[in-house]
Amino acid sequence: FTGDLADQQVLEEFARRVIQDYGRVDCIVHNALPLMKGIDQCSYEEFNYALRVGVTAPFYLTKLLVPYLAPGASIVNISSSRDRMSQPQTESYTAAKGGIAALTHALAVSLAGKARVNSISPGWIDTDFTSYTGPDADQQPAGRVGNPLDIANMVLYLCSDQAGFITGENICIDGGMTRQMIYHNDF
């Protein structure tokens, strides 16, 4: 299924198709990359688009699927470590990722007894499986840059019964970067 998550009709068609094909929902993973533009380049329309993809779509799709949640269902939202720290010119992305992190704990309370809702905030994740060495790896307390399996393993865990007592949490998977203070000439 392909479509623009910012389009309400696409979300409604997707939800209809899921229920038609499967009848119930065990796990929802919201993982969309909204537009990444900053204050110098991002238009009003682009900023709103980023929020529609990154926050409104997960909210609305969850709303559409709530009546079909199976017992023990889990919802995992993918946020970003940028929900707690920033780089210049990333306001649209940062706002959307901060929004999904806040939506996570709100939904966890509203959906109590129906689904567990958590989010993951990845840090630097190399999707090309490049082996980074030197300063790129050294600055990471974990000693390496993350890879998609680091995130996938947490998603699988949060969707499993083993995580049955975890809800409303935002788990940062960034190799410890948000816990480390870096000053000029530290690395």
Task: Go through each PLM region and give its residues.
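C-terminal helical subdomain
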Residues: 119-120, 134-166, 173-175
